[in-house]
Amino acid sequence: MELSVIALLLLGFVNFSWQNEQAPRVKTSLGDIRGYYKISRHGRKYEAYEGIPYAQPPVGNLRFKPPQPVQEWINELPAVEKGPVCTQYVVLSTPQNGDKVTGCEDCLYMNIYVPFRNGNESLLPVMFWIHGGAYQFGSGNKVNETLVMDRDVILVTFNYRLASFGFLSTGDSVVPGNMGLKDQNVALRWVHNHIRSFGGDPNQITIFGLSAGASSVHYHYLSRLSAGLFQRGISISGVALAPWAQTKYAPEKARRYAATLGCPTRNTKEMIDCLQTRPARILSQATGEVPDIYAPFGPVVDKYGPDPFITRSPIDIIVSGEAYDVPWISGVVSEEGLYISAAFVGNDQLLKQLNDDWDNIAPYLLDYNDTLPLNQHKEVAEKIRKYYLGSNPIDSNTSLSVTHMIGDRMFSVDFQKAAILKAKINKSPVWTYYYSYRSMHSCSEIVSGGSTKNFGVSHGDDAFLVLDTRISNVSRPNDLEMQQILLDFYTSFAIEGKPRAGDVQWQTLDPNEKEFQYLHIANPQNIKMETSNDSANINFWNTIDFNENKISGQE
């Protein structure tokens, strides 16, 4: 006990000393930046530069416009406090003050964390994190960087515009869309251009993200704007082919959205001029008027703008061979569907409601309301239910099957398709994984409103174990070991160009094999390569002709 107290006192003294010594400073072509020192999870000193603007504030006439380059500053920039989060409607929880709207429009800021170099001139690999949140919520500010700072990599986190501010599209040149993805691109370009000033290697940038951030990573492989700005990527539970990652009927949704705000909808310029006058808070509150469980506003084909992010559908870009050809890792967890189902699987009343009204709820729950004709909705709902549940009712005994149904449809099927296509068409290696380790805490606790019941391994449980403050401060030995395995996985890929997980030889995906190959991370003592000829029940889902990911000319 005495040794522990002494260690804590020494750590506090070191921390106090570092905070009071001369602050770290860097010089960039935009101006000087001053940061501050912090301590990593296991006691390493590192530099923190928080709240760095990477684009002009998208306010006033710049609302709904592509991001504009940040201007030079004259005085030293104090980068000692994170910038505000982007305006968003809080979906998964209610803040203590009860206000569901948070953030502001002036939010395009990044945070850069750099291991203390102590005179070492070697450039460090860079990891560029893209946060998730269905393109509607979230922030790079929520990342807990302290564990990553135990390794010799630079970590960059940032905010990008969300919901209507980042993804409204009129389907023409007025607001082509994808402002949020363009924010990401400008942030990535900023890092590519300036990270050398922080001791980072602009030719060793790994982009990685979770959920919508994972699909964003995939989108950067498909955009000519981002080609050359990074050397590898990791998509954690999300790809651009996922149904929620491609917005259907975006112009119609924009008009419906504008109508709820009392704006004219016949002329898109007049409509946007009107939306420009509405307070950000009102715009954020109105997002709930656009019916979509997953992402009412998200990525679109924006070929009408002067600097389009993508001019064709993701599938067309992929099969044409035009995607950026650099290494990629992609994977899923065993109960991806908990992203949605955790809100109801522990509630018998909600399960009964889902059971009784399945035919009407299924098209929205499984996101095919816009991709199948109305006269097929009931037939497909019954077909899916029969496959996963047989003749059983939806209740606590079958809730896991419902979770797997949602996860297969929304994440796992298209993850597999995207990985195989990239491995088949491009030359760079592709690695895939399947994560089924349940730690003491889970993201399902957030979605379920605090329930600690074990519903399975939730969407986000892998990345959050390393990067999120809400569940990353773990104490169980197996959880701590898994943290290190995942940290090795992410950082070894950034440093060496090949991922490492435990002592297993992680093989690349061979698209010519009949069975899908992946690394199964079951627990710290059980990590191995596996294969499947029907992963995510993909053969069943291929029998349903959704109007999704159709190659042009083959509709």
UniProtKB/Swiss-Prot annotation:
Keywords: Allergen, Disulfide bond, Glycoprotein, Hydrolase, Lipid degradation, Lipid metabolism, Secreted, Serine esterase, Signal
UniProt main location, coarse: secreted
A GO cellular-component term linked to this record: extracellular region
UniProt GO molecular function: carboxylic ester hydrolase activity
Membrane-spanning parts: none
Top-level taxon: Eukaryota
Active site: S211, E336, H459
Enzyme class: hydrolase
UniProt tissue specificity: Expressed in several tissues, including epidermis (at protein level), fat body (at protein level), gut (at protein level), muscle (at protein level), and venom gland (at protein level).
Entry-listed glycosylation sites: N120, N144, N369, N397, N473, N533
Activity dependence on pH, as recorded: Optimum pH is 8.5.
Signal peptide positions on this chain: 1-19
GO BP term (any one): lipid catabolic process
SS bond list: C86-C107, C263-C274
Enzyme Commission designation: 3.1.1.1
Coiled-coil regions, chain positions: none
Gene3D superfamilies, A to Z: alpha/beta hydrolase
Thermal behavior of activity: Optimum temperature is 40 degrees Celsius.
Protein name as annotated: Carboxylic ester hydrolase
The species this protein was found in: Bombus ignitus (Bumblebee)
